[in-house]
Design a protein with these regions (language model features):
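Generic protein-terminus/edge-of-domain signal
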Residues: 1-105
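N-terminal regulatory/effector-sensing and dimerization cores
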Residues: 69, 79-154
Length: 154
């Protein structure tokens, strides 16, 4: 996908459908903790399954604790993939076979890598090597870009 500067700005700041789902989930828990479980039970479970969304309150096991390179790059022929990190997505600790370069485009993100917590701010870059346990949390309008790199690239 090729974007000019204006199109990139629109894309990076707009909310994807899944981000809206996660934002609503986050706000429901934060603003109405007493009714949050009922809210979760009334969610569209077919939509959650079809979009592969993660709702910790509905899950009894870890969500994708290990991601293989072929799972992430299954329909992608290149070696480097860029994707926006979904704002408000639940924090889940995981590791994977590929490199992840986390770039904070705007705002802040909270990450834990191998048990050590970090706060990253605009302009910060964090390189996460394969087989490293980590997580990331963004619970506002901050923007982070993930650069995923196949291990075979090096």
């Amino acid at each position: 996908m090729k974007l000019n500067r204006s199109e990139f700005q629109d894309y990076i700041h707009s909310y994807e459908t899944d981000e809206i789902f996660y934002r609503d989930l986050y706000l429901a828990e934060k603003e109405h903790p007493e009714t949050f479980m009922k809210y979760c039970q009334e969610l569209d479970h077919e939509l959650i399954a079809s979009r592969k969304l993660y709702v910790p309150a509905l899950s009894k096991e870890a969500w994708y604790p290990y991601v293989e390179e072929n799972d992430m790059f299954h329909d992608f022929t290149g070696n480097i993939m860029l994707c926006k990190h979904y704002r408000y997505s639940p924090v889940f600790t995981h590791e994977h076979e590929f490199f992840e370069i986390l770039c904070i485009y705007n705002g802040t993100a909270h990450t834990t890598i191998q048990g050590i917590s970090h706060t990253l701010s605009t302009g910060d870059i964090c390189i996460i090597p394969p087989h490293t346990k980590h997580n990331i949390g963004i619970f506002d309008d901050s923007i982070a870009i993930n650069i995923l790199v196949r291990t075979s690239t090096f």
